[in-house]
Amino acid sequence: MSNALYQSSINSLPLLGHGKVRDNYAVGNDKLLIVTTDRLSAFDVIMGEPIPDKGRVLNQMANFWFRKLAHIVPNHETGIAPETVVAPEEVEQVKGRAVVVKRLRPILVEAVVRGYLAGSGWKDYQATGKVCGIELPAGLQNAQKLPEPIFTPAAKAEMGEHDENISFAEVEARIGIALARQMRDISIRLYKEAAEFAATRGIIIADTKFEFGLDDNGVLTLMDEVLTADSSRFWPADSYQVGTNPPSFDKQFVRDWLEAVRIDGKPWPKTAPAPQLPDEVIEKTAAKYREALTRLTGEELQ
């Protein structure tokens, strides 16, 4: 699978670090080069095999949304072509899968918005009738649409740790009341506008995660990735049914396989190392990512 990039090696720029999926490099003092690789992380563990084209799909999808939602909140884009900041022999590594962005002070809270009850939100609700301390009506089912989208923040965890759901009061305590409210209100607005658009393309955005930073003037700025198949749960509207887990356009396919796999007769404990993904799972996952891009944006992979 020659078109897959598991890890970049850009030697012409200082490496700042490898995230689960992205590799970050410094461009001067005020910008970053973010390379979206084909790594896949599930249950906060990085798989050993890349998913071909996944990084390019995510990059193109995020760029689509940054453009579409730019009227709501400033974002980290600079418009500088990534090919211009690396050495000629490194251009192939950044083509279609990298962006040059403003360097921001990240806010260490993940801004999660849920329009539907799913995943950890559904588990919380079953146990307590609430999600992140927010009271919900009784009798809701799995995958049910919520009366209004809710803001359910999470504390950003260290690499390999699970992000932890926190209450809104905790966010206010961490970053201040005014900023917390601004972040919540903008996140819900971004989600609503994106969900409305996605509905016209036959896709339900069940939930999504935004990340924000502050620029040098303290202005709240959208960063990282936005409304991609990695940061969101996308469901095809035509097969959606309340009470069942709809098939997602994301790594759910890998997650389901990992839940079912047995190692020496035992379930995988969701800790590294990850079991080796079969070719069929890799190919189906790659196809899901490409399908999400085309269905949602109307664009082919560039």
UniProtKB/Swiss-Prot annotation:
Pathway: Purine metabolism; IMP biosynthesis via de novo pathway; 5-amino-1-(5-phospho-D-ribosyl)imidazole-4-carboxamide from 5-amino-1-(5-phospho-D-ribosyl)imidazole-4-carboxylate: step 1/2
Keyword Nucleotide-binding: yes
GO cellular component: cytoplasm
CDD domains linked: SAICAR_synt_Sc
Protein EC: 6.3.2.6
Reaction catalysis annotation: 5-amino-1-(5-phospho-D-ribosyl)imidazole-4-carboxylate + L-aspartate + ATP = (2S)-2-[5-amino-1-(5-phospho-beta-D-ribosyl)imidazole-4-carboxamido]succinate + ADP + phosphate + 2 H(+)
This protein's record includes keyword ATP-binding: yes
Name by which UniProt lists this protein: Phosphoribosylaminoimidazole-succinocarboxamide synthase
Organism: Cupriavidus necator (strain ATCC 17699 / DSM 428 / KCTC 22496 / NCIMB 10442 / H16 / Stanier 337)
